[in-house]
C-alpha cells in the first residue's frame, strides 16, 4: 500500500540515483527558458543538451537518457524536431516529458502541434492549471501562458489525460500529481509565491521531471522534481524576501538538496482515491 513515508523514501532514492548517473537530458525548449533550464539541470545533478535542430534530433534523442519538450516559443523547425524526437523516444523506450505551454484556442497552432505530440505517449504531461484543464477538454480562459485556474480545481478535471500519458503533473500554489501507477492523487506543498515571478521556473521544472524520469518511474520522477522545487523554494523564501536574492538562493538550494533535506522538508499528502 502506498504511503507518504514510502513515497519520500522513493524520492530520496531517485535523487541519489540522479547524482550517481548524471542523466543526459535533451531539451527542446523555448528561447526564454533555455539558459535557466540548463542551469537548473546542472545544479540538480543532470546533464542538459539543448538540441532542437530537426537534422540532429533523431540521432541525439537515441543517445539521451530522457527528453523534455516545451512549447513556450515554438518555431517551425523546433516543431519538426519535437515530432522527430518524441517519435524516436517512443520507439526506443526513452522517457519524455511534454510541457504544453500556452495550450488553448488563443495559441491555436502550437495547440494543434501539442495534440499531435500526444500520439507519441509522453511519460509525463506537466503544466499549470489552465494548460492542463484545457488540454483535458475544458474551456478555461488563460492569461497568456499564465494560469487563471487554481491547481486544486484542475486536478479533478485532468483524469482524461491519463489515457495519453503515465502521469499528469499540475503546478500551482500546491502541486498535484495524477498517475496510472497509483490510485491516489499526490499533493505536494511548499515552495514560495516568488517562484512564479521568476521567468522559466515552470519550464525548468518540466525538464527536471525529465531528468528524474531517467532514474525513476514517471510518477516518482514527477513527485521528485516537484519536491525538489518545493523544498528549494521554501528554504530560499526563509532567507530572502525580494526577487533578486530569492532567485539566487533558490538556485543554491536546487544544488544543495540532499537526502536529509528531503526527509526533513518534503511535504506531501495522498488525496482522494480514484474510483
Swiss-Prot record:
Q: Which CDD domains match?
A: THZ_kinase
Looking at the keywords, is Ligase present? Answer: no
EC code? 2.7.1.50
Note whether Lyase occurs among the keywords: no
Against InterPro entries, the record matches this protein to: Hyethyz_kinase, Ribokinase-like
**Xref: SUPFAM superfamilies:** Ribokinase-like
Source organism of the structure: Acinetobacter baumannii (strain ACICU)
UniProt keyword list = ATP-binding, Kinase, Magnesium, Metal-binding, Nucleotide-binding, Thiamine biosynthesis, Transferase
> What family does the entry list?
Belongs to the Thz kinase family.
A GO BP term, please?
Answer: thiamine diphosphate biosynthetic process
Question: Which residues take part in binding ATP?
Answer: 126, 171
Functionally, this protein is described as follows: Catalyzes the phosphorylation of the hydroxyl group of 4-methyl-5-beta-hydroxyethylthiazole (THZ).
Please identify the protein, giving its name as recorded: Hydroxyethylthiazole kinase
Cofactor list: Mg(2+)
